[in-house]
């Protein structure tokens, strides 16, 4: 796997992955706080 093989910059992938994780964690904690976490 060479660093120049992909057309998408690594920082873009890392940013999207980070936002995805933050979103999932945020939804999880929001659901638990709202009391609907057990229904998921």
Curated annotation (Swiss-Prot):
Localization per record: Cellular thylakoid membrane
Biological function: One of the components of the core complex of photosystem II (PSII). PSII is a light-driven water:plastoquinone oxidoreductase that uses light energy to abstract electrons from H(2)O, generating O(2) and a proton gradient subsequently used for ATP formation. It consists of a core antenna complex that captures photons, and an electron transfer chain that converts photonic excitation into a charge separation.
Name the record gives this protein: Photosystem II reaction center protein J
Recorded family membership: Belongs to the PsbJ family.
Keyword Transmembrane helix on entry: yes
Organism in which the protein naturally occurs: Nostoc sp. (strain PCC 7120 / SAG 25.82 / UTEX 2576)
Assembly behavior: PSII is composed of 1 copy each of membrane proteins PsbA, PsbB, PsbC, PsbD, PsbE, PsbF, PsbH, PsbI, PsbJ, PsbK, PsbL, PsbM, PsbT, PsbX, PsbY, PsbZ, Psb30/Ycf12, peripheral proteins PsbO, CyanoQ (PsbQ), PsbU, PsbV and a large number of cofactors. It forms dimeric complexes.
Gene that specifies this protein: psbJ
Annotated TM spans: 8-28
InterPro entries reported for this sequence: PSII_PsbJ (IPR002682), PSII_PsbJ_sf (IPR037267)
Topological category with respect to the lipid bilayer: Single-pass membrane protein
